[in-house]
UniProtKB/Swiss-Prot annotation:
GO terms for molecular function: NAD binding; NADH:ubiquinone reductase (non-electrogenic) activity; quinone binding. It is a peripheral membrane protein. The keyword Hydrolase does not apply. Its EC number is 7.1.1.-. It comes from Bordetella petrii (strain ATCC BAA-461 / DSM 12804 / CCUG 43448). The gene is nuoD. Pfam families: Complex1_49kDa. This is NADH-quinone oxidoreductase subunit D.
Length: 418
């Protein structure tokens, strides 16, 4: 009798559930996974090497393009590493703005993660609902930086500019959008950015309730997630898990609480933790994190309303001159030109800065030789540690469960391939 052998299947890199350019080589016994071999590198752009040939400010936009769903959080770790080497501290208002936008970015990331995960499993409505809320948050990015995704808003020593007093309005009516629709859409945009964000934070808890109504007690959703991809706490720590992946396994580790940076020690929030370490618990952790991020944003909005002040450090070697001065003063124009073409020199040394990124612990290790460019930049991407556990998490599961596991890992290849 002929021996029945396992067969090998290519999953991706063109598969819609591969979250980018993941290529998985699956060894299958029938439809049960015996081995999962992730192939990475299809989105490698040599970010770490490119940064060595740019000044510290010119390398900043590369950070946005790492995890291109959590743009400002990537920038945050990078500017914190530079600030450590320079020995400077941004003004308190700039720190609150950074924390507020870190949490807006966390919402952007978790909404994308939740929507795409639900879509992978077969629930299409949640994806559309999540993108409805992401649109408002993208408008916040656009209001402060002019860009909806790659903001380049954080700067060594603070942020690019203070929060605007006006929000962009929707334009003329069309056959798709009448005058009444325009009035409703522009109603929340009649005030400042802080008014717009406050209006969003008032609406958002009800939106999260909508997602939970659709998913949390949904029989099919629970059948697809409960007991899938279980990782116990000890194994999660051994594999290098961080963020929701670690907290979903029951380990209450959050850098915002354990090693507070910026003003996280001045805001009130809780760290949600799972119990079983399966895909369902990780989903619940992300849902709870969205509620906590909303709380933090509300506190930041209240503080920023009552405390005007500078948003950039008073150090002219690092901070650019004011735009108004450049129009009348030749020295300011020369200063601006030299700062952005030649950059600033950073004292020799090394620094590591890590933040609680939406996906986990995102770190930047920066080595300076005293020049105006980094001597070495090393990126610690949380998704890299999560992806290497895919083989272990998927063994013994069906092919359909591999899709669920990839979704729960919240993988973005910009940061994994770098």
């Amino acid at each position: 009798m002929a021996e029945i052998k396992n067969y090998t299947l290519n999953f991706g890199p063109q598969h819609p559930a591969a979250h980018g350019v993941l290529r998985l080589v699956l060894e299958l016994d029938g439809e049960v996974i015996q081995r999962a071999d992730p192939h990475i590198g299809l989105l490698h752009r040599a970010t770490e090497k490119l940064a060595e040939h740019k000044t510290y400010i010119q390398a900043l936009p590369y950070m946005d393009r790492l995890d291109y769903v959590s743009m400002m959080c990537n920038e945050h770790a990078y500017v914190m590493a530079i600030e450590k080497l320079l020995g400077i501290e941004p003004p308190l208002r700039a720190q609150y703005i950074r924390v507020m936008f870190d949490e807006i970015t966390r919402l952007l990331n978790h909404l994308m993660s939740l929507g795409s995960h639900a879509l992978d499993v077969g629930a299409m409505a949640v994806f559309l609902y999540a993108f409805r809320e992401r649109e408002d948050l993208m408008d916040c990015y656009e209001a402060v930086s002019g860009a909806r995704m790659h903001a380049a808003y954080y700067r060594p020593g603070g942020v690019y500019r203070d929060l605007p007093d006006t929000m962009p309005q929707y334009g003329e009516s069309s056959k798709y959008r009448g005058e009444k629709d325009l009035r409703i859409m522009n109603d929340a945009r009649s005030g400042s950015l802080l008014d717009f964000i406050e209006d969003f934070t008032n609406r958002f808890p009800a939106c999260v309730d909508e997602y939970e109504t659709l998913l949390t007690d949904n029989r099919i959703w629970k059948q697809r997630l409960v007991g899938i991809g279980v990782v116990d706490p000890e194994r999660a720590k051994a594999l290098g898990f961080t963020g929701p992946m670690l907290r979903g396994s029951g380990v209450a580790w959050d850098l915002r609480k354990m090693q507070p940076y910026e003003v996280y020690d001045l805001v009130d929030f809780d760290v949600p933790v799972g119990v079983n370490g399966d895909c369902y618990d990780r989903y619940l952790v992300r849902i709870a994190e969205m509620r906590e991020s909303n709380r933090i944003i509300r506190q930041c909005v209240e503080w920023l309303r009552n405390n005007p002040g500078p948003v950039m450090v008073e150090n002219h070697k690092v901070a650019p001159p004011k735009r108004t001065g450049m129009k009348t003063n030749m020295e300011d124009l020369i200063h601006h030109f030299k700062l952005f073409t030649e950059g600033f020199h950073v004292p020799p040394g090394e620094a590591f800065a890590s933040i609680e990124h939406p996906k986990g612990e995102f770190g930047i290790y920066l080595v300076s030789d005293g020049a105006n460019k980094p001597y070495r930049l090393k990126i610690r991407a949380p998704g890299f540690a999560h992806l290497q556990s895919l083989d272990e998490m998927a063994r013994g599961h069906m092919i359909a469960d591999a899709v669920t596991i990839i979704g729960t890992q919240d993988i973005v290849f910009g940061e994994i391939d770098r």
